[in-house]
Structures are given as structure tokens and as C-alpha cells.
């Protein structure tokens, strides 16, 4: 059975996702360190930080707010860097006449109230069979490593920029 800190975490997560009022007094004395730990573990630290903006009934300790704001600013910068990387990658692929659809991660992040506050990860591209073959030829020489291909899921490569980005392809079979 989830504890009060888990319940408070979900309260803040809902508030951050849907910009709804959050009431934490119902959970009594919450452990903000545990809530932040859960948020980091689930890669939703920025969303939980956004949820804190909607707390109406208790005062969140200043040191907690400062720590979360600092972490969220780092997430925001990582997203800005990733968005620049994605734009450059898509432009490079277009020059090679490769057409891809950005899916999951960075694409879905744009649906969030604060897209830059969502933890960024890898780059997932949906490609036709022909475009996948073209992308393999283009990206493999640039990669720091190339992964084994599987019939249903293909993780093509790790590219060397700051954080490791991957090009994926999932088949519908």
C-alpha cells in the first residue's frame, strides 16, 4: 500500500501535468526528499516542480523549492540542447533524402504544459524500410557504436554528442 509520500508525489504529478490545484495538507508531514527521489526515479522531476506551483494549502520549504528549481533549470537546458540536436539531425537526414517521423520522447513532450520541464531521453524516429536503410548507411559511420538489429525492434546506433542519442525503428509486425 502506497505511503503518504507516494500519495503526495501523485498529487504533485497530477497538478503538474494538468495544472490542477494540489492540496498536500491531507497527507500530513510529507518528506520532500522522498518525493524528489521518486520524481527523479520516474524521470518526472520537472513535472513535479510544475505541480508545486499549484500547491494552495501548505508552504513548501524554500530549500526544497530552490533545489527543485535548480534541477528543473538543468532539465530545461538539456531539452533545449536536445531540440537543437533533433533539428540538426532532421535537416541532415532531409539532405540525404531520408524522411523520418519523430515519435515518443521529444515529440510527445510538446503536448506537456511545460515541454522543456519533461526529462529528455533518446531520439526515436519512425522510418519506412527504404528510409531505414538510408539512415543506416548515413549514421553508422558517425556512430560511437552500432547495435545488433532485431526483426521487431531496431536500435541503430549511439551518436557521440553530449548525451547519447539513439535512432530507433519499430516494425508493426
Tell what function each PLM region has.
Residues 16, 51, 138-141:
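Acidic/proline-rich low-complexity IDRs
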Residues 78, 86, 140-173:
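Conserved catalytic core of two-metal-ion nucleotidyltransferases
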Residues 58, 112-113, 158-159:
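Short Asp/Glu-rich motifs
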Residues 2-11, 18-104:
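Helical scaffold of the NTase/Pol beta-like nucleotidyltransferase catalytic core
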Residues 87-136, 140:
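Active-site nucleotide-donor binding segment shared across nucleotidyl transfer reactions
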Residues 61, 65, 119, 164-166:
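Alpha-helix boundary/capping detector
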